[in-house]
Swiss-Prot record:
The chain crosses the membrane at residues 4-24. Its EC number is 3.1.-.-. The keyword Amino-acid biosynthesis does not apply. This is Ribonuclease Y. It is found in: Cell membrane. It is a single-pass membrane protein. One of its GO terms (biological process) is mRNA catabolic process. Residues 329-422 form the HD domain. Keywords: Cell membrane, Endonuclease, Hydrolase, Membrane, Nuclease, RNA-binding, Transmembrane, Transmembrane helix. Gene3D superfamilies: Hypothetical protein af1432 (1.10.3210.10), K Homology domain, type 1 (3.30.1370.10). Its main location: membrane. CDD domains: HDc, KH-I_RNaseY.
């Protein structure tokens, strides 16, 4: 019973609590709704107030903008009116100025028309007066107008021709003076930049000896060594009282140098006899060929000329042992190449061509004693043979005036050749004449058939002639020596007498095996 009562009480209490809670919750909800509505109302009121405020601000701003635009429009309108007024005033002023100018122009036209009428009247009067004067002049002079005009034109033409001739002469004189001045300047610059060596040529070479005993060994038994040496080399070997020295004398520098080299080798070797002399002379000739080639290559290098044919190099080397009036021809050729190159550079011509032609211009002198003809013709033939250009050939051919120079380089070679030859101390007449006489003496002997070699010795007082034994017998040698002596008497001028010696040698060699 009590338990049921407790259950009922609990149920009743729970129900009451539930009902109470429900109403409490509902009451709280209504209170929240009321509070939210109040807040919403406040928000709406605030928004309405803010919107009203912004609306008023927008209206104020719009009014201000309208006022600003109105002021701007009014200002621009005032400025435009002012500008229009200024332009209107300028137009009025221009119109007034144009009116004044038009009025002045009309006055000038009236004056010009009046002046033109006066000038026309004066022209007619002058024409009539001129015609009257012409008639009077024709009556007095007896010439028609056309005849007088022709005479006047002829006089004027003569006067103008004289003035033109004087003007041309003056211009030519100034041009020539300027050309001479520039030429002197170019040549002086070239000469100042060219430092040429002077070589004093000699016909002897002095060879030192280790002792006086060596002189006897050089002479040999009954002079066989010295005779063999002189016969093989074609020079004079002078052994005198000069202490510890012998002298090699010969006008041909190549022979003299070959003999010097051979004798120095013999002295160094110590074995001196005819067979050894022949061997050393042959070796010296080969060494001489090498030295000639090296000399030619050095000359081409000094002249800055490249691409020469090897045979031309050898011919250049031979020029070292050739003189022209005492001037070394190789030194002269290098000097001409250098001068021609400098002048060509100043004139903006072909410097390489000028140097090449200058180096080769006297190459014919290397063989002119072996080949007939002037050295210019020989040089042209040699250069053509070894593939030189037509410009180089022309410069060589024209350097002595045998051809008219047609290029600037050819003229420069002529000038450089003359400058080098005319330099004080460059050439001597005496030595050249002496060498020419000895060369002529040898040429006379070599012109006869059967002659193998001919050597002029003893300063031209003796000539030794080697003949071919298979072509000239003993009787033929007697006839030949007389013919050579007679031809020397007829063709050569010389002091005193010349000894002509013919040597006929038959050499038989056999080897024992």
């Amino acid at each position: 019973m009590l338990e049921n009562t407790a259950i009922i009480i609990a149920i009743t209490t729970g129900f009451v609590a539930f009902i109470g809670g429900y109403f409490l919750r509902k009451l709280l909800g209504e209170m929240k709704i009321t509070s939210a509505e109040e807040r919403a109302r406040l928000v709406l009121e605030e928004a309405a107030k803010e919107a009203e405020s912004k609306k008023r601000e927008a209206v104020v701003e719009a009014k201000e903008e309208i006022l600003k635009l109105r002021n701007e429009v009014e200002r621009e309108s005032r400025e435009r009116r002012s500008e229009l007024q200024r332009q209107e005033r300028r137009l009025v002023q221009k119109e007034e100025s144009l009116d004044r100018k038009l009025e002045a122009l009309e006055k000038k036209e009236e004056n010009l028309a009046k002046r033109e009428t006066e000038l026309a009247k004066m022209h007619e009067e002058l024409k009539a007066l001129h015609q009257k004067e012409l008639q009077e002049l024709e009556r007095i002079s007896g010439l028609s107008t056309e005849e007088a005009r022709q005479i006047l034109l002829q006089d004027v033409e003569k006067e103008i021709q004289q003035e033109a001739a004087l003007l041309v002469k003056e211009i030519e004189g100034r041009a020539k003076e300027e050309a001479d001045r520039r030429a002197r300047n170019i040549i002086s610059l070239a000469i100042q930049r060219c430092a040429a060596d002077h070589v004093a040529e000699s016909t002897v070479a002095v060879i030192p000896l280790p002792n006086e005993e060596m002189k006897g060994r050089i002479i040999g038994r009954e002079g066989r060594n010295i005779r063999a040496f002189e016969t093989l080399t074609g020079v004079d070997l002078i052994i005198d009282d000069t202490p510890e020295a012998v002298i090699v004398s010969g006008f041909d520098p190549i022979r003299r140098e070959t003999a010097r080299m051979a004798l120095e080798k013999l002295i160094s070797d110590g074995r001196i006899h005819p067979a050894r002399i022949e061997e050393m002379v042959e070796k010296a000739r080969k060494d001489m060929e090498v030295q000639i080639r090296d000399t030619g290559e050095q000359a081409a290098f000094d002249a800055n000329v490249h691409g020469l044919h090897p045979d031309l190099i050898k011919l250049l080397g031979r020029l070292k042992y050739r003189t022209s009036y005492g001037q070394n021809v190789l030194k002269h050729s290098v000097e001409v190449a250098y001068l021609a190159g400098l002048m060509a550079a100043e004139l903006r011509a072909d410097e390489k061509l000028a140097r090449r032609a200058g180096l080769l211009h006297d190459v014919g002198k290397a063989v002119d004693h072996e080949v007939e003809g002037p050295h210019v013709t020989i040089g042209v033939d040699l250069a053509k043979k070894y593939g030189e250009s037509p410009e180089v050939l022309h410069a060589i051919a024209a350097h002595h005036g045998d051809e008219e120079p047609e290029t600037v380089e050819a003229v420069l070679i002529q000038a450089a050749d003359a400058i080098s030859a005319a330099r004080p101390g460059a050439r001597r007449e005496t030595l050249e004449a002496y060498v020419k006489r000895l060369t002529k003496l040898e040429d006379i002997a070599n012109s006869f058939p059967g002659v193998e070699k001919a050597f002029a010795i003893q300063a031209g007082r003796e000539i030794r002639i080697m003949v071919k034994p298979d072509k000239v017998d003993d009787l033929g040698a007697v006839r030949l020596v007389r013919d050579i002596a007679r031809k020397i008497e007829n063709e050569l001028e010389y002091p005193g007498q010349i000894k002509v010696v013919i040597i006929r040698e038959t050499r038989v060699v056999e080897y024992a095996k």
